[in-house]
């Protein structure tokens, strides 16, 4: 074999130099192939001795080449060489052995030859798009974007492409990525920020592509497991009515009975989105699928499990649609187990498209943020033991477990366990009281002398040390720590005793209590991490609401660029980042730096801007009321009501009315609903219908007015005259005094930057 058929002259020379500088010993190289499959660049990963070298596969990306030299000149691979090559070959990697002079080569696993694509045959007057859809308008900008992505696939490069509104970017990225994946038997992930865009892709764009490409391929929308009903949790709930039930309990049991009927007679998927009515999060959390509450194959409902049935369908799919949050949840698992793993949420993938890519930084930062709150603490403690409802299955996991133990143990065994249970409950009550006391004092501390209904404040322990209320918080926290230690001892003793009886636990009552105990330990760690506030690189802050008194405590990382670079961008190359808003001053430097792409120097990143085909000056107008009250004024929304009513009437509805909070949405909806006749207008309020139904109602109604929050700010496709205006009550920009924004600005200035 000729070395030049596999490695470029420059790369060969670089390897000779590195081998020479290593004293002729073994060197482990990463080989980076060009678009033709020739290794054009090499990077030293490890150096060894005359007979071996460390093979650090975790440093390699997909579709690269591991190269090492045999100083003896005998290029026959060892058993270890073959084993490592086999492992890397499973993810599309190649493996070569060379001699020290790099003029002889042994190819253990050849580099996979990728079939290149050309989208030209699909565009133009005689293209497949025009043939299938004569009225389908191919825009020049759309074709231009598709060609950029075609090149990034063929050349194995990352691409950042800003595509203005109206480009038709979903078709522009779906066509080349799907063509490339189908031709080369690869898997594509499309990650979006909004459910609206996911539904547009699945219900409109992808079926359209199927007709254009004329190739059969599978695609799935991958939802988080929390969207699926858990049969074990559902059927473990006692729904028999008791005379002592409160009205709230009766209502909840009725909803659970409806869910049981829905599961038995209606749904095939168990997807919450299929429900024809809204259900509160607090009730859904009692019946939804959760990773730590899942018994897997040991569950009696495993064969009929909605979540696992959904997961079986994604294994064979060429295209998977996910949201950004799920993508980063999956990435966190890969960070712990290795990028190419069998333990991740998503199957291993080859191509990633980030649509609505401007949200990546915030989504990743939110995912790596620690959070606790008074409400979540109370809910978790209530799931373990609800002291307000002690005589039913709603009394918490320990009550359900004791009911099961009473049926499964002898009276002597049960009596022993019951004593230990009483010790646990006594300490649970102490722990709960101390925790709530801390949260209540924090609410007072952060809302003192502040009349706003929502307060965001940075927690500066140095400044707060002189505050009496804060000192009281820290004193109670010492007691909270002590109670936690006692609680752990008592629960461990209780669980050890129960575990010694080797019960079958088919329904999972012991399993459920153990899982809630693990959650409690994780919750306490997060709480102490935030309250102690010692870790560098985080901003510690609080969000207080005074209407329904609650305080949320956060620890948010300043910078997530290293996390993304190390765990994602260095692992693969065929990635597309697209949105209508990525560039600043026609450059992508700010965006690349914010998410870690600026650190990516091994491969060139293509950067393109595709202008919008819209003539904004002729096709739209912007109206701003100059006499509106300041948005911080409590009368702000009431003051806007007349202006908004006039604006809606000017277009006879056909408008989106968008808000940054549910309270503002509900207030304005109640103000306006009596002013618009039901015969003339159709008012559609978020939470009255599932999101996808809201869009369908809007598209097919007379003079529609949609009241929505962040779900409708982007990723919504309503064509033609049905949507004439968008009314934005407040721009959803971060204010400079937002604790996280403020901390990021401080950190930038600290580094001598603007």
Residue map of PLM features:
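Conserved RecA-like P-loop NTPase helicase motor core
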Residues: 613, 625-635, 686-754
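Signature of the SF2 helicase/ATPase Hel1-core->accessory helical subdomain module
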Residues: 173, 179, 199, 204-207, ...
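Conserved interdomain hinge at the start of the Helicase C-terminal
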Residues: 566, 625-660
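Walker A/P-loop
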Residues: 154-176
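Conserved helicase motor "Helicase C" RecA-like lobe of SF1/SF2 P-loop NTPases
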Residues: 660-687
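Conserved beta-strand-loop surface patch within small alpha/beta domains used
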Residues: 1-62, 74-113
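A contiguous, basic/glycine-rich beta-loop/short-helix subdomain that forms a polymer-engagement track
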Residues: 284-315, 331-341, 487-626, 686-697, ...
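A substrate-engagement module of RecA-like helicase motors
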Residues: 116-132, 137, 185-187, 191-320, ...
């Amino acid at each position: 074999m000729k070395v030049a058929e596999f490695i470029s002259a420059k790369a060969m020379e670089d390897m000779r130099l590195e081998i020479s500088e290593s004293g002729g010993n073994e060197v482990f190289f990463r080989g980076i192939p060009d678009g033709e499959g020739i290794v054009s660049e090499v990077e030293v990963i490890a150096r060894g001795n005359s007979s071996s070298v460390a093979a650090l596969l975790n440093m390699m990306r997909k579709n690269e080449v591991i190269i090492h030299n045999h100083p003896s000149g005998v290029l026959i691979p060892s058993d270890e060489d073959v084993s490592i090559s086999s492992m890397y070959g499973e993810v599309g990697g190649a493996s070569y052995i060379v001699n020290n002079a790099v003029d002889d080569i042994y190819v253990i696993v050849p580099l996979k030859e990728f079939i290149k694509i050309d989208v030209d045959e699909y565009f133009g007057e005689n293209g497949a798009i025009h043939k299938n859809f004569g009225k389908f308008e191919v825009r020049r900008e759309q074709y231009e974007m598709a060609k950029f992505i075609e090149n990034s696939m063929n050349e194995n490069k990352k691409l950042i492409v800003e595509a203005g509104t109206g480009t038709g970017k979903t078709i522009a990225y779906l066509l080349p990525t799907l063509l490339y994946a189908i031709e080369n038997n690869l898997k594509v992930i499309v990650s979006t920020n909004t459910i609206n865009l996911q539904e547009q892709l699945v219900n409109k764009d992808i079926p359209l592509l199927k007709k254009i490409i004329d190739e059969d391929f599978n695609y799935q929308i991958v939802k988080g497991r929390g969207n699926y009903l858990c049969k074990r949790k559902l059927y473990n709930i006692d729904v028999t009515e008791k005379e002592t039930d409160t009205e709230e309990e009766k209502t909840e049991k009725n909803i659970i009975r409806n869910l049981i009927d829905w599961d038995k007679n209606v749904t095939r998927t168990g997807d919450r989105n299929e429900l024809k009515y809204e259900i509160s999060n607090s009730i859904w959390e009692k019946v939804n699928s959760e990773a730590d509450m899942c018994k897997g194959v040991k569950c009696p409902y495993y064969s009929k499990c909605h979540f696992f049935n959904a997961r079986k369908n994604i294994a064979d799919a060429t295209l998977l649609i996910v949201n950004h949050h799920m993508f980063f949840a999956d990435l966190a698992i890969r960070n712990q187990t290795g990028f190419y793993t069998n333990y991740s949420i998503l199957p291993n993938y080859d191509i990633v498209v980030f649509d609505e890519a401007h949200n990546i930084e915030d989504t990743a930062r939110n995912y790596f943020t620690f959070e606790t709150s008074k409400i979540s603490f109370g809910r978790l403690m209530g799931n373990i033991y609800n002291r307000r409802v002690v005589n039913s299955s709603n009394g918490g996991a320990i009550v359900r477990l004791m009911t099961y133990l009473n049926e499964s143990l002898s009276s002597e065994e049960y009596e022993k366990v019951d004593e230990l249970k009483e010790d646990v409950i006594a300490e649970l009550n102490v722990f709960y009281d101390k925790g709530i006391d801390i949260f209540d004092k924090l609410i007072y501390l952060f809302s003192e002398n502040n009349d706003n209904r929502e307060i965001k404040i940075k927690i500066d322990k140095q400044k707060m040390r002189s505050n009496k209320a804060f000192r009281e918080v820290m004193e109670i926290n010492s007691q909270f720590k002590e109670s936690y230690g006692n609680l752990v001892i008592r629960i461990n003793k209780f669980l050890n005793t129960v575990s010694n009886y080797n019960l079958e636990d088919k329904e999972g009552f012991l399993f459920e209590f153990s899982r809630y105990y693990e959650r409690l330990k994780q919750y306490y760690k997060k709480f102490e991490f935030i309250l102690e506030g010692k870790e560098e690189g985080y901003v510690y802050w609080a969000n207080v609401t005074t209407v329904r008194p609650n305080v949320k405590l956060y620890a948010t990382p300043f910078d997530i660029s290293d996390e993304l670079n190390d765990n994602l961008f260095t692992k693969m190359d065929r990635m597309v980042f697209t949105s209508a808003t990525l560039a600043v001053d026609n450059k992508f430097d700010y965006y690349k730096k914010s998410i870690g792409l600026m650190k990516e120097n091994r491969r060139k990143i293509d950067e393109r801007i595709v202008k919008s085909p819209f003539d904004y000056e002729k096709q739209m107008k912007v109206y701003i009321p100059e006499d509106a009250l300041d948005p911080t004024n409590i009368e702000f929304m009431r003051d806007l009501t007349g202006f908004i009513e006039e604006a809606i009437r000017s277009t006879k509805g056909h408008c989106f009315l968008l808000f940054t909070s549910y309270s503002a949405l509900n207030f304005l909806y109640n103000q306006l609903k009596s002013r618009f006749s039901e015969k003339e207008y159709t008012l559609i309020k978020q939470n009255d219908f599932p999101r996808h139904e809201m869009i369908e109602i809007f598209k097919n109604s007379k003079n529609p007015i949609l009241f929505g929050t962040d779900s409708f700010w982007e990723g919504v496709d309503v064509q033609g005259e049905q949507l004439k205006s968008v009314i934005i009550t407040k721009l959803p920009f971060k204010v400079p005094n937002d604790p996280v924004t403020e901390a990021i600005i401080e950190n930038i200035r600290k580094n001598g930057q603007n």
